[in-house]
Structures are given as C-alpha cells and as structure tokens.
C-alpha cells in the first residue's frame, strides 16, 4: 500500500503542474493578451494606443510604464532577480525599467529574466500587417492576428481582412494538383488539397495536428469545417487606388460602390437624357417663334417720320 502524501508534497506537485501548464500555454497565448501588445492611454494627450515606451502621437513618457514581458508596473524589493538594486520597498516609473525592446517599442523591467528572454521571445518580432504592410513603428495601434490565416493585422484592417479571408483564389473547391475534391484548405495560400497531395517530404506532420500545406507549411484545416467561398469580394479601404501621397481611403470604395450600383441604370439614364435634350430643342424653337412675333408687334405702330425707307425722303430733298 503506497504511503499517504503529505501536505508539502501535494503543494509541490500542484506547483509543478501549474508551471508545466504555464510553459505549455505560453506559446499558444493570444496575441492581444501579451503585455507588449496591451492597450495604453497616454497621460498627456489621452489617446489610446499600443503599449509603448513613448507616446506615438506626442512622444511623452508614461508615469507608470508596463513591462513588455511580465506586465508589471511595480518592482518589489523581495524579488532577488533585479539587476538594479533599489533601497525602497518597491520601485515604479523609470526606476523600474531597464531597456526598450526594438521590436515592440515597449519598456522592459530591470529583472534579469525579462531582460534576457524578452528580445528572443517577443511576439512582435516580424509584426507587419499583411494588408497595408505597416509595422509597429509605422502606426500607433495594436497588432492582431487573423483567426484563419494567422497573419499579422493592424487595427484598421483586422475586421475587413477576416471578413474576406475565407475566400479561395479559385473558381472551384478542387485540388490544385488534380481534379479531386480538396478536403484540406490552406488559408494562407488560399488553395485546397486532397489527402494524397497534402503529404509533403519537406514539411512533416506532427501528431495530433492537421497536415501542413505542401507549399508554405502552414497547418491546413478541413474544408467542411470552414465557410469557404470561391467568390471575389471587393470591399474595404484597400481596394481603392492610392492617392498622390500614397495613402488610400474609403472614398474610392464608396465611388466604386456607387458606380456598380448605378451601372445597370446607365442605359435608361442615357435615353432620358436624349429625350430631355429633344424637348429642350423643341421648346427653344417655339420660344424663338414667339419672341419674333412679339418683337414684330412692338414695332408695327412705331413712326420714325419721313425717311428714305418710307419713300418720302426725295420730296424733302426737292424742297430744299
């Protein structure tokens, strides 16, 4: 019969289990919940943005910096991990920070573990929006990940991209390499593959996971579990042409929408314009005739005396 576990042994086993779960869930944590991608409101301009060392809009330093690795705003003296020893019970503000991350542009506290591990494990290392190709330093908003293709997205394009992400770049759901129905879909390549053509010599399939895409290696998903479509949806701020300064907005989108909406009625509009032009010409002709008649009526009773036109001028010359 096994020995009964003591209280200290139970606590140690529970602690080891919690640490194991934390290590396992650290790689699968949501990008929006990372401390380096947390929401921050500037103390000076009151504008909400991503967690940064300096405000993106007014370049002011925050009163309570947030560590990009552990997310704390206060460093306690009890923790012996501090690189910079502080005399007080705790330290806040600039006395707590130790570095600025080059990837996420956020403060890192002066803890030895955070300083040595954050730069290698920063989730925003290659965070460039797949739609507008802007990085962390190019805009002030937070970074998100598409729930389908897992590419990085900025705040401006996250909803529009995810609304149009489940669209294949093909007219059918057939496999790219053959005519059989594609049972697995890669949402990065926007293509379907059958069971035979998902097997790749380059990318190996891990246990308990879906087969990788033979083109890019991204994990595929079953087509039946997705709301896949083969139509091309044209909407959003990225569909319009760029302006002179390189920026694109919603003006081109609304113009395209209006042109598509009234494209079917253009033929009828042209006919109506022709009829209106003919009516205007007829009205002008009638108006011209009426004006001539009115002018003739005005000059009928006008008497200019004896003139050459009246035929009496030669009598006056003879008298003289």
UniProtKB/Swiss-Prot annotation:
Biased composition (Acidic residues): 269-287
Motif Nuclear localization signal mapped to chain: 3-11
Residues with PTM Phosphoserine: 291
InterPro entries according to UniProt: NOA36
Residue spans of biased composition, Basic and acidic residues class: 10-22, 216-225
Pfam family, any one: NOA36
Signal peptide start-end: none
Localisation per UniProt entry: Nucleus; Nucleus, Nucleolus; Chromosome, Centromere
Name used for this protein in its record: Zinc finger protein 330
GO molecular function annotations of the record: zinc ion binding
Family statement drawn from the similarity comment of this UniProt entry: Belongs to the NOA36 family.
The entry's keywords: Centromere, Chromosome, Metal-binding, Nucleus, Phosphoprotein, Repeat, Zinc, Zinc-finger
Highest rank taxon of the organism: Eukaryota
A GO CC annotation given for this chain: chromosome, centromeric region
ZnF locations on chain (C4-type): 42-58, 67-104, 129-149, 175-189
Region (Disordered): 1-23, 206-250, 264-303
């Amino acid at each position: 019969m096994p020995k009964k576990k003591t209280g200290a042994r139970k606590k140690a086993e529970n602690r080891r289990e919690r640490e194991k779960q934390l290590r396992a869930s650290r790689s699968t944590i949501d990008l929006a919940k990372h401390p380096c991608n947390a929401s921050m409101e500037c103390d000076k301009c009151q504008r909400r943005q991503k967690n940064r060392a300096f405000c993106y809009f007014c370049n002011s330093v925050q009163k309570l910096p947030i560590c990009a690795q552990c997310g704390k705003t206060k460093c306690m003296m009890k923790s012996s991990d501090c690189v910079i020893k502080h005399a007080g019970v705790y330290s806040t503000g600039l006395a707590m920070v130790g570095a600025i991350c080059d990837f996420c542009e956020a403060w890192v506290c002066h803890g030895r573990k955070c300083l040595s591990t954050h730069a290698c494990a920063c989730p925003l290392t290659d965070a460039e929006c797949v739609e507008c190709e802007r990085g962390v330093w190019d805009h002030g908003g937070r970074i998100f990940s598409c729930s389908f293709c897992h590419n990085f997205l900025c705040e401006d394009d996250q909803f529009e991209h995810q609304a149009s992400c489940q669209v294949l770049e093909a007219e059918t759901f057939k496999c790219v390499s053959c005519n059989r129905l594609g049972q697995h879909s890669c949402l990065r390549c926007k293509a379907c593959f059958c069971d035979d053509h998902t097997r790749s010599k380059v990318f190996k399939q891990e246990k308990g996971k879906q087969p990788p895409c033979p083109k890019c290696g991204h994990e595929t998903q079953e087509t039946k579990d997705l709301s896949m479509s083969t139509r091309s949806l044209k909407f959003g701020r990225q569909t319009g042409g760029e302006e002179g300064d390189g920026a694109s907005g919603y003006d081109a989108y609304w113009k395209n929408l209006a042109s598509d909406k009234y494209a079917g009625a253009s033929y009828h509009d042209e006919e109506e314009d022709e009829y209106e032009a003919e009516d205007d010409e007829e009205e002008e002709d009638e108006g011209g005739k009426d004006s001539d008649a009115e002018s003739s009526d005005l000059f009928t009773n006008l008497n200019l005396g004896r003139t050459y036109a009246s035929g009496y001028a030669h009598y006056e010359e003879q008298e003289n």
